[in-house]
Amino acid sequence: MRTRITAVLAAGLLAGCQNQAFNEIGRAPAMSPIGSGLQYTQTPQLAMYPKQPRHVTNGYSLWNDQQAALFKDARAINIGDILTVDIRIDDKASFENETDRSRKNSSGFNLGASGQSQTSDFAWSGDLEYGSNTKTEGDGKTERSEKLRLLVAAVVTGVLENGNLLISGSQEVRVNHELRILNVAGIVRPRDVDADNVISYDRIAEARISYGGRGRLTEVQQPPWGQQLVDLVSPL
């Protein structure tokens, strides 16, 4: 029995040692290799977008249908091109709900009987009452405030059949022993990219924007993995 318990504890210790944070004790968090977050493959879900009709370009014309204007700098339109994503998120939301419900019910009835015989008299009576009372109250309030202003360069990783672009970009900034990571990905239209080769985040379809980090401060803010496991399986 002791051998089994020791084996279980050793397995748990080894599982915890495999954590990346364990390997970074006494050192700053390591940065990811350049280009590790880029994927140049198109997923099957993108087949829902229609194909772009082919346009015949005359050899003597200076106009390009993939550009919004003639006398402006070229913007990102091909795989491998780079454009800048302007992220300016300033959202506030407040929700408040209140519920009050009550119900009261009561009922009762009487029973009685009497009789007489040659030897004795008898009488019997009884009362029965019952009631119920239920009450439910609920009050909930949620407030959220988010503000984020960043510029990040993204790479065109794919071109859909209708001409829209798949973009993906990441940025890592390490300050002391804390690594801040910004990831952005989505689908953009070439015409939405302005003359400075910049696109706003609200022009990105299927946008995936994440801003987080890794390091000592993040580890302190997160509960230990053992406590997270107990919270997950605990019925109370």
Curated annotation (Swiss-Prot):
GO biological process, one term: bacterial-type flagellum-dependent cell motility
Record's keyword terms, sorted: Bacterial flagellum, Cell outer membrane, Lipoprotein, Membrane, Palmitate, Signal
InterPro entries: Flag_Lring (IPR000527)
UniProt keyword Cell division present: no
Segment forming the signal sequence: 1-16
Lipidation (S-diacylglycerol cysteine): C17
Compartments where located: Cell outer membrane; Bacterial flagellum basal body
Family: Belongs to the FlgH family.
GO cellular component labels: bacterial-type flagellum basal body, distal rod, L ring; cell outer membrane
Disordered: annotated span: 96-143
Compositional bias ranges of the Polar residues kind: 105-122
Name recorded for this polypeptide: Flagellar L-ring protein
Membrane topology: Lipid-anchor
PANTHER family: FLAGELLAR L-RING PROTEIN
Quaternary organization: The basal body constitutes a major portion of the flagellar organelle and consists of four rings (L,P,S, and M) mounted on a central rod.
Task performed by this protein: Assembles around the rod to form the L-ring and probably protects the motor/basal body from shearing forces during rotation.
Species this protein is from: Rhizobium meliloti (strain 1021) (Ensifer meliloti)
MF terms (GO), sorted A to Z: cytoskeletal motor activity
Lipidation (N-palmitoyl cysteine): C17
Pfam families: FlgH
